[in-house]
Structure formats: C-alpha cells, structure tokens
Amino acid sequence: MGLRPWMTRAHAPFLLATFLCAAAPLLADEPLFDLKPIAEGVYAAIARPKFILNCNALVVVLEDGVLVVDTHSKPSAAKGLIDQIKTVTDKPVRYVVNTHFHWDHNQGNAAYLSAWPGGVEVISSEATAESVEQRGIPRIEHEIATRPKEIERLRTEASAAKDPVARLKLEGQLKETEAYVAELKNMQMKLPTMTFDHNLVLRRGPRTVLMLVLGKAHTDGDVFVFLPKEKVLASGDALQGWMPYMADGHPYDWIRTLEDAQKLDFDMTVGGHGDVLRGKGQFELWKSYLRDLMAETAKAYAGGASLDEARTRVADALATRYESRFSAAGLPAESFRPSLTGNIEKAYRVVSGQQD
C-alpha cells in the first residue's frame, strides 16, 4: 500500500501552526500538557507546543477508573500525561479512545497498556481501527526511514546558525527529533481492542459517556465523545481550535457531520488541538469556511482553472473572509496561507472527481 499525503508534506502546515504557537522551548522537566478542570472529575489536557506534534486529550474520572480520549504522538508523551493524571486521581485508566487514525492521536496507546497490563480497553470506530492497522503502522516504518534526513538538516542548520537563540531552537528540535526516531524504533503499535460502527454508551456510576460516529469528516471514522450531564464534547480533529486539516477529509460530509454534532447539548468542546472551545462559534466558522472553500474551488474548476490557478484564486477569495477570523480563533497568522493551500488542493481533487 502506498504512502498517503497526510504522512509527509501535507501535514506540514498543521505542524507549522503548532510550532509557531510556541513562545519558548519547554524545559525537560516541564509537563507536556496543561491539565485544566472543566467539570467535576473532567479535565482537558491541552498539549503544549512541541516540534513533534502532540494532540490534546480529554480525561474523565469514572466510578471504576479513568477514560482518556487520544494518546498523542508517542508513548513517552502518553506517559507524561499518565503522570499528570496521577496527580488528580489514584484510579487506574480503564478506557482509552482513539478519535481517528492519525499518528498524533494514537501512537501513545502502548503507554496505557504498559502502565495497566490487561486492564485497558482501547476503543475506536471500526473504520479507525482498520486505518490504524493498514496506514498507521506503515507510516511508522516510513518515519523511521525518512526522519534521518530531517535530523541531518537540523544538525547542519544548528551548526551554521550564528544567532544564539536560533541555534538553541534548532538544537532543541534536533534533540527532540532524534529522541522521537529512537522511540519509534522500539515501539510496538497497539491497536484498538474494542470497536463500534455507530455509537457506544458507557455507564459507570453517575457518569454516562457517549461515543458517537456521526458521519465522515476529518477522516472516514471520526469519533465524538460526549458527556451529556457535564455538557462536554471531545471532537478529535473533526473540530479543533485552528483550521480544518483536510488531506483525509470528506468536505461535503464534514459539513453535515458538524451540523449533527452541533445539535448535541454541550457548552464546551475539547478539540484535538488548540484551547478549550466555549459555545458553538467554532462550528459555525468551520462550516462557513468549508462551504466557501468548496464553492470557490468548484467555481474556479468550472471556469477552467488549473490547480495552480485555483490555488491563487481561491486563496485570494478566502483570505479576506477568514484570515482574521482564524487568527482570532488561535491560528498563527503565518500558517494561514500554507494551511489554506493544502486545503485548496484537496478541494480541487474533490470537485474534479479525483476524490470524494
């Protein structure tokens, strides 16, 4: 099976958004996450910016243990969150949910199974489990094979850097990338152990957790995790604090899926990246953006525009409408155009019939 665009170049703007958010490199002993209480026994673990991307997590304390939504880019990151979880509860993690198959949301699964052998269920949609096995595992092999080139680039740039701040930054990136590759070489990917197609309900004491597949969106198997009593939603990357990342997305379905998710009664959303979202304004922003992106791209294609021409036309049309709105939502201004370009390429493939 061939490698897909999300594995390499197409993820670059999304990674850029993460890195540009960092004001300074984290010290080795600093936590990787800000663990924010958002309801009684419910925490948003907001990932601090790192060169090797981590996702956010939702931590839910249940009667018989803890449920965690998403496990980040590597076991060591998940281990870091496990240590932070132990500061707020002595209950074991019993359930881990993978919202979708992308690497930065599930490569830490093994840390939970190591911490509590035989006592953790890894839950996902059936579509996500299949994609983790068929695409996620080959991606790990691809990373091990290709990251050394990045390591050499970083080493060269760090050696040549004359500015001490720039050199320190590059040396930090180099160290982080070397550690990541070493960890991948020794990592055994742990696949979901429990899957479902439409919804799964977990009732533990007074807490009810709904796991919902509402339709195609960011991928073909996105899971929303909903706490009806607490009015909290975890959305993975189907809705997060920056721009949509569309390489594996289904834009027309995505709009409908967001509409269905929006009908749920929630006050807060913990997306895969960015800060906790209050209200439903981000849903409206994303739906509007997706509609306009597809309409402008379809218009350009119908007018005979090539992909290169569409990139320029659609970017110019959407920049005036959305650059300031996404910047206000937390996306660094420097990453708006690169992120938009990748999404235009996806939209063009859809309107031209190359993809759905």
Task: Describe each PLM feature range.
Residues 69-71, 94-102, 123-126, 213-214, ...:
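Active-site neighborhood of phospho(di)ester-bond hydrolases with catalytic His/Asp-centered motifs
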Residues 208-264:
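Active-site-proximal loop/helix segments of hydrolase catalytic cores
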Residues 302-356:
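C-terminal regulatory/interaction regions
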Residues 86-192, 201, 296:
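Active-site HxH/HxHxD metal-binding segment of metal-dependent hydrolases
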Residues 10-25:
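Bacterial N-terminal signal peptides
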Residues 36-87, 223-237:
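Conserved beta-strand hairpin/beta-sheet module of binuclear metal-dependent hydrolase folds
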Residues 37, 185-191, 195-227:
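Core dinuclear metal-dependent hydrolase active-site scaffold
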Residues 255-309, 313:
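Divalent-metal (often Zn2+) His-rich catalytic cores of metallo-beta-lactamase-fold enzymes
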